[in-house]
């Protein structure tokens, strides 16, 4: 008859308890220990699932330690059959010998749970303080992890929290127990109940993490069959063959959602519009030119103002085109995008029309915002110093012209000293004729020579003109 030994803590004194019911007073419990009387060893506290008995409960420095034996042939046969269908149990370690029975027990029932009386009912005279010990998926007390082995000494020596003297004492007391003298376990439970308990264990929150904590609290060695450590690779399953046989597993309902075609396209268009609205980051030239490069006097020449949507030529000679706001592409909405079932057309069309109207309003608002963002800023015209004079040419360009002589002002009058006036000739009138001389022949009149005044002497009228011109020039 094959048997399996199980060992582990049913209570760790140093670890705090969440529920006061789980608290055990070690001073009172030590009076009932060691317990050499066998008590039942069952599954998940089910009375019909007795699979073995305990062969000793001991009080050690770290807590209360339990040693038991599983000797139900029916249960061991069931466990071996479960191993071939469990992928987790087949994830073995290459550093440990291949033991299917131990692998399945550590996967299915990795913890211990002690059934004892309530702390208020505990007393030294009560000899039935402990009812049974259960193998379960997760114990309520921390540190209550189980270790299965075919050898009794190997199962006890896996715990580093027990001193060597305590290990020898427990081993000497446990090995003297006659397994054949133990009562025959009654394992008559319905397999459906065990399946239900296994399903409930799958929904324990952070079960794997708690098992790792229990392993650390109990101070178990690293190389064990316990699955609360690193999981190895399966030894028998072929992944490629399994995929060809069963096909690709479809994704669950939580990973997939159904969205109408029009809604998806609207969301995609909104993302594109938001992406276009973000302006490109401004690029500024470096503050200082690299070594050996030409350094102009003006690092940042001001931009000439040329109005809205008109390109201009930079002093470096590069042409900057005009910026016009671009309208995003609009998709024509089709009536047959969304299909409706018979009897729902009237209600669905009303909702669809309202949705389309709201979507159109949102698109119009986005277009207005985008047009406002893309519109260039207006700067007032300002004068600036430039080594070249700007001569207006074409309406959209500026061309350069060299410096020329300033044109004379036409509205200014020249000074009087520079103007030469024509000489004034005064007429010479002859005296009237007399009676005595009327009979005489008329003598030809001799004209006097005209005298031209070429001196610098000025007339009073010329002085007034000069004063008037000087007054105009000085203003």
Curated annotation (Swiss-Prot):
The record marks 228-229, 454-455 as: Cleavage. Residues 455-475 are annotated as: Interaction with major capsid protein. GO terms for molecular function: identical protein binding; serine-type endopeptidase activity. A motif (Nuclear localization signal) lies at residues 327-333. The active site is at residues 45, 113, 132. Its EC number is 3.4.21.97. Residues 254-273 are annotated as: Interaction with pAP. One of its GO terms (biological process) is nuclear capsid assembly. Residues 426-454 are annotated as: Disordered. This is Capsid scaffolding protein. It comes from Saimiriine herpesvirus 2 (strain 11) (SaHV-2). The lineage of its organism: Viruses, Duplodnaviria, Heunggongvirae, Peploviricota, Herviviricetes.
């Amino acid at each position: 008859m094959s048997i399996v030994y199980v060992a582990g803590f049913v209570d760790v004194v140093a670890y705090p308890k969440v529920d006061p019911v789980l608290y055990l007073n070690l001073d009172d419990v030590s009076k009932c220990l060691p317990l050499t009387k066998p008590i039942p060893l069952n599954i998940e506290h089910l009375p019909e699932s007795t699979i073995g008995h305990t062969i000793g409960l001991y009080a050690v420095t770290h807590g209360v330690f339990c040693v038991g034996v599983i000797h139900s042939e029916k249960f061991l046969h069931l466990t071996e059959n479960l191993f071939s269908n469990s992928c987790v149990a087949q994830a073995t370690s290459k550093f440990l010998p291949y033991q299917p029975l131990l692998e399945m027990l550590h996967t299915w029932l990795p913890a211990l749970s002690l059934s004892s009386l309530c702390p208020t009912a505990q007393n030294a005279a009560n000899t039935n303080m402990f009812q049974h010990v259960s193998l379960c998926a997760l114990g309520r007390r921390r540190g209550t992890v189980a270790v299965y082995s075919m050898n009794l000494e190997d199962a006890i020596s896996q715990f580093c929290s027990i001193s060597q003297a305590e290990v020898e004492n427990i081993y000497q007391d446990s090995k003297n127990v006659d397994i054949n003298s133990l009562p025959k376990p009654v394992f008559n439970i319905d397999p459906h109940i065990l399946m239900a308990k296994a399903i409930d264990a799958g929904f324990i929150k952070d079960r794997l993490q708690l098992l790792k904590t229990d392993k650390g609290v109990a101070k178990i060695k690293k190389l064990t069959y316990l699955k609360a450590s690193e999981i190895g690779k399966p030894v028998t399953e072929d992944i490629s063959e399994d995929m060809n046989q069963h096909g690709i597993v479809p994704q669950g309902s939580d990973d997939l959602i159904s969205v109408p075609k029009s809604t998806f396209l609207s969301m995609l268009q909104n993302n594109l519009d938001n992406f276009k609205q973000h302006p490109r980051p401004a690029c500024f030239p470096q503050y200082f030119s690299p070594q050996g490069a030409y350094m102009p006097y003006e690092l940042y020449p001001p931009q000439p103002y040329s109005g809205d949507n008109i390109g201009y030529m930079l002093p470096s000679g590069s042409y900057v085109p005009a910026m016009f706001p671009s309208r995003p592409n609009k998709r024509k909405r089709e009536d047959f995008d969304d299909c409706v079932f018979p009897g729902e057309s009237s209600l669905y069309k009303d909702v669809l029309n309202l949705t389309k109207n709201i979507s159109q309003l949102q698109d119009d608002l986005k277009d207005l915002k985008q047009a406002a963002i893309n519109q260039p800023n207006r700067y007032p015209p300002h004068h600036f110093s430039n080594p070249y004079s700007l001569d207006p040419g074409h309406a959209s360009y500026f061309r350069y012209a060299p410096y020329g002589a300033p044109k004379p002002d036409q509205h200014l009058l020249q000074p009087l000293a520079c103007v030469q006036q024509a000489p004034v000739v005064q007429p010479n009138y002859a005296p009237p004729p007399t009676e005595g001389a009327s009979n005489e022949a008329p003598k030809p009149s001799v004209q006097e020579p005209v005298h031209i005044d070429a001196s610098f002497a000025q007339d009073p009228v010329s002085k007034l003109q000069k004063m008037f011109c000087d007054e105009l020039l000085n203003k």
